[in-house]
Structure formats: structure tokens, C-alpha cells
Curated annotation (Swiss-Prot):
Keywords recorded for this protein, A-Z: Fatty acid biosynthesis, Fatty acid metabolism, Lipid biosynthesis, Lipid metabolism, NAD, Oxidoreductase
Catalysis: reaction(s): a 2,3-saturated acyl-CoA + NAD(+) = a (2E)-enoyl-CoA + NADH + H(+)
Naturally occurring in which organism (per UniProt): Treponema denticola (strain ATCC 35405 / DSM 14222 / CIP 103919 / JCM 8153 / KCTC 15104)
Gene Ontology terms: biological process: fatty acid biosynthetic process
Stated family: Belongs to the TER reductase family.
GO MF term set: enoyl-[acyl-carrier-protein] reductase (NADH) activity; NAD binding; trans-2-enoyl-CoA reductase (NADH) activity
Protein name: Trans-2-enoyl-CoA reductase [NADH]
Misc. comment: Possesses high activity for the reduction reaction, but no activity for the reverse oxidation reaction.
Residues marked Plays an important role in discriminating NADH against NADPH (site): E80
Length: 397
């Protein structure tokens, strides 16, 4: 059949297998051009890498950079729905297939484990695989985005919420497909919702992974572990950083400090990344309007980055520098949101957001760029793919 995107409430309900494959191949191509022999000369390099949440966005870019930039062996974990002959799989499932196929072609070791990374069963599978291969991890990337987590100790399923504290949040958001502007409101969270969000999106599971891998002797001396986070602009603070998600991110940062204290042989960091269109960010109110405005400003300035540009910069200019140092802020966080939060960028973005109406959103902001990134994360609007061609089956790429 001919496959067109099915979008409802900022969620794309289907995926294009060949589009996903081409998207992965394009990122691999970019990585090879960016992480040159000159970039790597005299710097340490990752050899054995575990990526938790490897199938989309920053996690996928991290795995691609490790493997195709530095030649690392990778184990990836993600929870995806497989395609069948007649039914769509999730984009991440096709991305994983494309990654493994490309790795095999280049003789790179890659194992993708499909399942709930929050569970102890999946941790045991990773441990078994690493022992079988005889490797210790020197880089562990924690890039999980999930609305729910079942606590392995209690069996209780916790659900995260995106809510402010204290008072109702009201802000402008835009429908990226119609340009329609609307006010949205979010009611304040109660204590139970805040605690549940920390359970899902805080550092508890990250710490559990590190402890179990450490106990089994699978962490290389000097192993780096990273968890990804976001701070963002003033416009989203009340809902995001000063709300329930912010509470979880604070817990994540506290976890990094604790991991460093308890495991002197490893280095744990939170990496604060740029705001981008991912399957996770597309459903956050206010974010589409902010990102469409940000993209406009940064593209005009010439320093706009997507996931792969951000992550190759993270590896080349933060994690694996020639002088061996990892630059951090006063909270020991790696900052690659630096270009996003430059004062002139934020001033220009705020000014744009003030002027936006339903009539001028398309011309004033980069809604077209936002739409492209949103569709491309599901395998659509990818250059070089004929979307009028029939897709014969959905269980392969």
C-alpha cells in the first residue's frame, strides 16, 4: 500500500519503513564526515558502549556516533513494536533494524535488545550479553523517555505527568500542521503525581543499572555514564523545569552526584541538551511554538543543530577531547544547550513568540522546519524516498 502519515493530536500513528532506514543512513553519513581521523587523533575513544533508549532521537544519535564515528561495539536497549507483514511497526523498530544492518555491513559488533529497560529481566539480558562477548562498558548512555515505569521492587506502575506546581499554567501553543494558535492550561500537580513523575523520570533506574553492572564487574575503569536532560527557556519554566518534570530532572542530577561519590572509578554526568523535535517533545504544550521560533532564529544565525549534530559535538567537543578534560558547569553538568541559551538567541525567540498569531505563524516562525523534523522522526518527508511507491510489507526495511 501507499503509506501517508496519520497524525492525531501531535502524535504520528504510523511509520514509513524505508524512510526510517534512510534517516538512519543519513545520520551515519553525517557522523563519518564530522568525526574525522583528525577529530579523533590524540583523544580517547569509546570502545564498548551501552545505550539505554537506543531507537530514536538522542539515544539513536548516541549509538550511531559511538559506532560509526568511533568504531565502538554497541549494545542497545529499547521497547518497540515490531512490524508484521500487514501492520506498521514503531519508527524505533525500523531504526534499530537499519542500525543493525549498517553495523553488520561494516563489521561492527551490535546487539539490540527489545524490552522494558526499567525491568531487572532486561538488565540480566544485557549482563549476560556483555559477559558472553567478554566486554566491560566504557560509556553508558541513559536516554529513556517513557510515560510509565513499573518499580521492580514493588511491582507498582508509576505514571509521569507534565504539570506545574502551585497554580494553573496557561500558555500559547501552536498546531504545527494548521498554524492555529491556542491557549492551553495545565492544572497544578498534587504530591502523589510529583512523586510518581520522579519515580519514572528521575535517576532511580539509571542508578539501578549502574549498580547491577558494577556488581557484575562490567564497568571499565574510568567508565563515563550520561543521562540526558533539558532546561529550556523562561517561556517553559513554570510547566517544565519548575514543574513535575523539573523535580524528576533534579533527582537525575542528584543521582549523578551520588554515583560519582559511591563509584570513584566511574564518571557520571547529566548532559543538558538542546530542545529538539523528538517523538517525546512533540506532545509537550508550548514546546512546538517555542521550537518553531527557536529554529527560525538559529537557522538564520547558522548554528541550528538536529540530534546527530548535537551528539557528534557532545562526543568530539565534550566527552573525547584531545586534552582529556570534560567541561562542565558549576553543577557538574555537561552543557550542549549553550548555543540555544545564548542571550541574543533567547531575546530574538521571545520577541518572535510575542508577535505570533494564527495568521502569521507560518511566515514568522519555522513551522515548516518543525513539521519536517516531526515527520522525519517517523520516516516521512525524508529526502530521496518515493512516497508514491507501494510499501509491500511492514516487517522489513
Amino acid at each position: 500500500m501507499i503509506v501517508k502519515p496519520m497524525v492525531r493530536n501531535n502524535i504520528c500513528l504510523n511509520a514509513h519503513p524505508q524512510g526510517c532506514k534512510k534517516g538512519v543512513e543519513d545520520q551515519i553519513e553525517y557522523t563519518k564526515k564530522r568525526i574525522t581521523a583528525e577529530v579523533k587523533a590524540g583523544a580517547k575513544a569509546p570502545k564498548n558502549v551501552l545505550v539505554l533508549g537506543c531507537s530514536n532521537g538522542y539515544g539513536l544519535a548516541s549509538r550511531i556516533t559511538a559506532a560509526f564515528g568511533y568504531g565502538a561495539a554497541t549494545i542497545g536497549v529499547s521497547f518497540e513494536k515490531a512490524g508484521s507483514e500487514t501492520k506498521y511497526g514503531t519508527p524505533g523498530w525500523y531504526n534499530n533494524l537499519a542500525f543493525d544492518e549498517a553495523a553488520k555491513r561494516e563489521g561492527l559488533y551490535s546487539v539490540t535488545i527489545d524490552g522494558d529497560a526499567f525491568s531487572d529481566e532486561i538488565k540480566a539480558q544485557v549482563i549476560e550479553e556483555a559477559k558472553k562477548k567478554g566486554i566491560k562498558f566504557d560509556l553508558i548512555v541513559y536516554s529513556l523517555a517513557s510515560p510509565v515505569r513499573t518499580d521492580p521492587d514493588t511491582g507498582i506502575m508509576h505514571k509521569s505527568v507534565l504539570k506545574p506546581f502551585g497554580k494553573t499554567f496557561t500558555g500559547k501553543t501552536v498546531d504545527p500542521f494548521t498554524g492555529e494558535l491556542k491557549e492551553i492550561s495545565a492544572e497544578p500537580a498534587n504530591d502523589e503525581e510529583a512523586a510518581a513523575t520522579v519515580k519514572v523520570m528521575g535517576g532511580e533506574d539509571w542508578e539501578r543499572w549502574i549498580k547491577q553492572l558494577s556488581k557484575e564487574g562490567l564497568l571499565e575503569e574510568g567508565c563515563i555514564t550520561l543521562a540526558y536532560s533539558y532546561i529550556g527557556p523562561e517561556a517553559t519554566q513554570a510547566l517544565y523545569r519548575k514543574g513535575t518534570i523539573g523535580k524528576a530532572k533534579e533527582h537525575l542530577e542528584a543521582t549523578a552526584h551520588r554515583l560519582n561519590k559511591e563509584n570513584p572509578s566511574i564518571r557520571a554526568f547529566v548532559s543538558v541538551n538542546k530542545g529538539l523535535v523528538t517523538r517525546a517533545s512533540a506532545v509537550i504544550p508550548v514546546i512546538p511554538l517555542y521550537l518553531a521560533s527557536l529554529f527560525k532564529v538559529m537557522k538564520e544565525k547558522g548554528n541550528h543543530e538536529g540530534c546527530i549534530e548535537q551528539i557528534t559535538r557532545l562526543y568530539a567537543e565534550r566527552l573525547y577531547r584531545k586534552d582529556g578534560t570534560i567541561p562542565v558547569d558549576e553543577e557538574n553538568r555537561i552543557r550542549i544547550d549553550d548555543w540555544e541559551l545564548e542571550e541574543d538567541v533567547q531575546k530574538a525567540v521571545s520577541a518572535l513568540m510575542e508577535k505570533v498569531t494564527g495568521e502569521n505563524a507560518e511566515s514568522l516562525t519555522d513551522l515548516a522546519g518543525y513539521r519536517h523534523d516531526f515527520l522525519a522522526s517517523n520516516g516521512f518527508d525524508v529526502e530521496g524516498i518515493n512516497y508514491e511507491a507501494e510499501v509491500e510489507r511492514f516487517d522489513r526495511i
